[in-house]
């Protein structure tokens, strides 16, 4: 059977046009999403499978995107091991019992994500039934470091000083935490694949806060172990593609090839061809338009998107995306026009 365009690109196979999807493609910029959000809290939407499935499908019905991504959040996974999570107005996520010591880490519970985040697993099943063969479905998780950073800081942070302090001062406690989170993330992604996810993405939103040497020592081995675990445990041959996306990591791209991910996501802080050269020819790349570009006039959006496609130079293995999630102020029509443009412009090139 012919692979969907997105899955073919993940495996660096020729496609008739560049596949496109957008991080946070189901979100506040869409009126359909806002209509649901007016009636439900964010975590209620995440934890109600029928709502999460409906929201996941909204972009597929509105735009010619080549993949769906399950509507979920990275942080509820932490609730299962004993952390207390709320979303506060104007503050974002808050962990009310952050991890600040080896004793805090030792007190974490063992848990099975199939039970603790069963609502997301069920949402994946519902979406797969509705999608049928129309488009692949992407599952995802936060990567161990990013989850650890939220758990230690108690929420978002500009400098991650508490996380780094724990990492440096209590290296054994740090390893214990990362091993626990690696086990959780691996099991969660495997459960998503078992439920029908066709590919999975690891979001390492905060890894760019680290020095390269610290990333290599304290983070990379656990990303590698996650990917090994998922491939070995998912029961699918060949295993579904795994995407690794870290924000602010342009200075570490050469190291990211060591993750052994099938696809490396690039943010907007590097030219796509330069980033691809650094991760190497044996890896597909995803990206990398600055999401704020979508606030510009269409002529500017088109020019910048064309530049990215030109830099990809028709090489198999490029998935067009943004360098981060769609921002709430983005015009819906710009998203639609961009998806159409990527297909039309890239189809004029030869993909072989």
Swiss-Prot record:
<comment type="pathway">
    <text>Porphyrin-containing compound metabolism; protoporphyrin-IX biosynthesis; coproporphyrinogen-III from 5-aminolevulinate: step 4/4.</text>
</comment>
<comment type="similarity">
    <text>Belongs to the uroporphyrinogen decarboxylase family.</text>
</comment>
<keyword id="KW-0627">Porphyrin biosynthesis</keyword>
<protein>
    <recommendedName>
        <fullName>Uroporphyrinogen decarboxylase</fullName>
        <ecNumber>4.1.1.37</ecNumber>
    </recommendedName>
</protein>
<keyword id="KW-0456">Lyase</keyword>
<dbReference type="InterPro" id="IPR000257">
    <property type="entry name" value="Uroporphyrinogen_deCOase"/>
</dbReference>
<feature type="binding site">
    <location>
        <position position="324"/>
    </location>
    <ligand>
        <name>substrate</name>
    </ligand>
</feature>
<dbReference type="GO" id="GO:0006782">
    <property type="term" value="P:protoporphyrinogen IX biosynthetic process"/>
</dbReference>
<comment type="subunit">
    <text>Homodimer.</text>
</comment>
<feature type="binding site">
    <location>
        <position position="150"/>
    </location>
    <ligand>
        <name>substrate</name>
    </ligand>
</feature>
<feature type="site" description="Transition state stabilizer">
    <location>
        <position position="73"/>
    </location>
</feature>
<feature type="binding site">
    <location>
        <begin position="24"/>
        <end position="28"/>
    </location>
    <ligand>
        <name>substrate</name>
    </ligand>
</feature>
<keyword id="KW-0210">Decarboxylase</keyword>
<dbReference type="GO" id="GO:0004853">
    <property type="term" value="F:uroporphyrinogen decarboxylase activity"/>
</dbReference>
<feature type="binding site">
    <location>
        <position position="205"/>
    </location>
    <ligand>
        <name>substrate</name>
    </ligand>
</feature>
<keyword id="KW-0963">Cytoplasm</keyword>
<dbReference type="InterPro" id="IPR006361">
    <property type="entry name" value="Uroporphyrinogen_deCO2ase_HemE"/>
</dbReference>
<dbReference type="Pfam" id="PF01208">
    <property type="entry name" value="URO-D"/>
</dbReference>
<feature type="binding site">
    <location>
        <position position="73"/>
    </location>
    <ligand>
        <name>substrate</name>
    </ligand>
</feature>
<dbReference type="InterPro" id="IPR038071">
    <property type="entry name" value="UROD/MetE-like_sf"/>
</dbReference>
<comment type="function">
    <text>Catalyzes the decarboxylation of four acetate groups of uroporphyrinogen-III to yield coproporphyrinogen-III.</text>
</comment>
<dbReference type="GO" id="GO:0005829">
    <property type="term" value="C:cytosol"/>
</dbReference>
């Amino acid at each position: 059977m012919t692979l969907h365009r997105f899955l073919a690109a993940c495996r660096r196979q020729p496609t008739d046009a560049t596949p496109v999807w957008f991080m946070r493609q189901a979100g506040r910029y869409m009126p359909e999403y806002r209509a649901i959000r007016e009636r439900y809290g964010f975590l209620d939407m995440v934890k109600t499978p029928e709502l999460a499935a409906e929201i996941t499908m909204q972009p597929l019905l509105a735009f010619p995107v080549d993949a769906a991504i399950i509507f979920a959040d990275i942080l509820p996974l932490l609730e299962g091991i004993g952390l207390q999570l709320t979303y506060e107005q104007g503050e974002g996520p808050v962990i009310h019992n952050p991890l600040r010591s080896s004793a805090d880490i030792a007190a974490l519970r063992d848990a099975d994500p199939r039970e603790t985040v069963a609502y997301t697993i069920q949402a994946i099943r519902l979406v797969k039934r509705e999608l049928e063969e129309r488009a692949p479905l992407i599952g995802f998780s936060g990567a161990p470091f990013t989850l650890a950073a939220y758990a230690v800081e108690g929420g978002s942070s500009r400098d991650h000083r508490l996380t780094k302090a724990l990492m440096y001062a209590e290296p054994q406690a740090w390893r214990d935490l990362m091993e626990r989170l690696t086990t959780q993330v691996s099991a969660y992604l495997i459960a998503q694949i078992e439920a029908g996810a066709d590919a999975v993405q690891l979001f390492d939103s905060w890894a760019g806060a680290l020095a390269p040497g610290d990333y290599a020592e304290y983070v990379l081995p656990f990303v590698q172990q996650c990917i090994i675990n998922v491939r070995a445990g998912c029961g699918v041959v060949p295993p579904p593609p795994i995407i690794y996306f870290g924000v602010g990591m342009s200075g570490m791209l050469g190291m990211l090839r060591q993750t052994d991910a099938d696809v490396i996501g690039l943010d907007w802080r590097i030219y796509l061809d330069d980033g691809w050269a650094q991760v190497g020819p044996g890896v597909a790349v995803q990206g990398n338009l600055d999401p704020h570009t979508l606030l510009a006039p269409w002529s500017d959006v088109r020019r910048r998107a064309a530049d990215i496609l030109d830099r990809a130079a028709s090489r198999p293995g490029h998935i067009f995306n943004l360098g981060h999630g769609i921002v709430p102020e983005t015009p819906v029509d710009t998203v639609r026009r961009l998806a159409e443009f990527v297909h039309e412009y890239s189809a004029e090139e030869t993909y072989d």
